[in-house]
Amino acid sequence: MEKWYDKYLSIYGKTFDEIPDSVLDEIKNNLAEKQSPEPLVSIVVIAYNEECRLAACLWSLSELQTKYPIEILGVNNNSKDRTEEVYQRLGLPYFTELRQSPGFARQCGLENAKGKYHFCIDADTFYPAQYVDLMMTKLTKPNVSCVSSFWSFFPDENHSRFGLFLFEMIRDMFLFVQHFKRPELCVRGMVFAFNADYARKVAIRTDIRRGEDGSLALSLKPFGKITFLYNRKARPVTGYGTIGSQSLWQSFVQHVKIQGKGLSRIFYKKDHYEDSEDNLVKRE
């Protein structure tokens, strides 16, 4: 059965030169048509060495169906490959952040975005057409500061569709239970949107390697709730950056070991977290 993301997957992993000009022209024209001079929503892609994945992500964003005025921006986070050329070829407004980390890249995007509502986008991920509007049904509610969603992986020769179904079902059940007391731990950058006015009053952490999005969500709690959208039509599809070369079973066992150590946390709230040394960015 054909999936909504199959055509984006057809160029995913291909070098810049391997993508047909006709496809690149289509993406470029679609992106240009989406840009509003007075956006309510900013959709900001961060990319580090994503030459072989960025165009597929932008193709999906170019086909968003939304009733809101939007802008789509890019951040080139000190890439050493041809990521910048992809932005240029597709005519996407972008900014360069030489300080390398997701935190610095997210901060650069926030500083240059115009919209009241800010959507974080990862360059190795595909987004369904209704993603923005469905997320906005939550984000525009009173007393909400930010919203996150679930996500899926696309099947490949090493990850079967049935195996992914089981893996995601168990993961989603755990995240659902966890979100009642610790919603900030359920937030992932690829599926994160927030009120930009609130975010500019706090700080996106640039001193940690992972978890800057969850940390931002925690900082936004005084302004409103962290809420979640449970809708299959708003479920992005991504690659295996969070799993790496592991099999699903290996990843599952690793997650069980990690989450099992602090399982009691799902029963109480927390407003402050201590940093672990291995997650701190070393300053030269």
Summary of predicted features, one role per range:
Residues 59-69:
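Short, acidic, metal-binding catalytic loop of nucleotide-sugar glycosyltransferases
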Residues 130-161:
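Conserved donor NDP-sugar-binding/catalytic core segment of glycosyltransferases
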